[in-house]
Amino acid sequence: MKNSPKSKQQASSSKIKVKSLFLINDDYNSFDHVVDCLTAICDHDEIQAEQCALLTHYKGSCEIVIGDATDLEPIKEDLALYGLNVEIL
């Protein structure tokens, strides 16, 4: 018996909706504080955290984590507790 491939419509409806957690620039958190939070909470390594902090500073925002909205919500709450401005889009 041969399995028939799913149609494109069926495949797209069964996918998990991927969301992104964005770090938004602000004027009150220090660069080091942002890097420390990203390494501790988002499991970024030092270089990745520094790059995200720089991109956020110069571009206004940076995508820091990708995943399902239910997985991103606790990360968002933890970062917000440390004073970072984050948003799930």
Locations of regions flagged by a protein language model:
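Terminal domain-initiation and capping elements
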Residues: 1-89
